[in-house]
Amino acid sequence: MDSPTLEDRENSIEDCDDDDDNIYINEETEEGHEKVLVTHAPQERIVPPLNFCPVERYLYRSGQPSPVNFPFLLNLNLKTIVWLANEEPQDSLLEFCDTHKINLQFAAINPDAGEDDNPWDGLTEHSIINVLQTIVTKENYPLLVCCGMGRHRTGTVIGCLRRIMGWNLASVSEEYRRFTGSRGGRILVELLIEAFDTALVEIDKKNAPDWLLTSLE
């Protein structure tokens, strides 16, 4: 299965419509495309987090959000943020989640790591499964998966999700490397994704997102 293009994203915003003196956008809703009048520019800058990208409908990925990104995140109406690290995120993100009643889930990379271990390296199979169980449950949506830079740890989890969805390894690898920058991907990450046993993730079809059910048909 090839990687979908940006035009395929269900939650995309369509081109501007300038058929009169007003400015509109055609915004997709559950009932179809609804024309929304834009009356004024936003009062705050709308800046997405580093490496932000929609993954599927109401599922997003990024690096660690900072205060400049919070107005953007509010527009997503997030219910859950999954943090992929042993250490806590910045205090500003903790306060943001607390203020706006967003469930912040800590997915420790290695819960048994000692003080001398590098908290930025690798993901355990157990932690990946825990995150994926959150992702395949629609009651946690809208949902953001993030790590420090939004590259390797987030890429590992999303890569394993794509395996569940039936993507071929070439497409999974291409998506992972799209976010790794000039330094390129890590072969160990790609090997982990390839070896991941997708059967370890339990999917309740009554509580799974629609896009996941479609991919499993």
Swiss-Prot record:
Residue ranges that the Swiss-Prot or TrEMBL entry lists as coiled coil: none
UniProt-listed GO biological process terms: cellular response to oxidative stress
Protein name: Putative tyrosine-protein phosphatase OCA1
Record carries keyword Cytoplasm: yes
Any Pfam family matching the protein: Y_phosphatase2
Gene that this sequence comes from: OCA1
Composition bias, Basic and acidic residues: 1-12
Keywords, in A-Z order: Cytoplasm, Hydrolase, Protein phosphatase, Stress response
Tyrosine-protein phosphatase domain: residues covered: 51-209
Example of a GO MF term: protein tyrosine phosphatase activity
Compartment(s) of residence: Cytoplasm
Family classification: Belongs to the protein-tyrosine phosphatase family.
Enzyme class: hydrolase
Major place of residence: cytoplasm
PANTHER family registered for this protein in UniProt: TYROSINE-PROTEIN PHOSPHATASE, TYROSINE-PROTEIN PHOSPHATASE OCA1-RELATED
EC numbers: 3.1.3.48
Organism: Candida glabrata (strain ATCC 2001 / BCRC 20586 / JCM 3761 / NBRC 0622 / NRRL Y-65 / CBS 138)
Role noted for this protein: Putative tyrosine-protein phosphatase required for protection against superoxide stress.
SUPFAM superfamilies: (Phosphotyrosine protein) phosphatases II
CC per GO annotation: cytoplasm
Catalytic activity: O-phospho-L-tyrosyl-[protein] + H2O = L-tyrosyl-[protein] + phosphate
Region (Disordered): 1-21
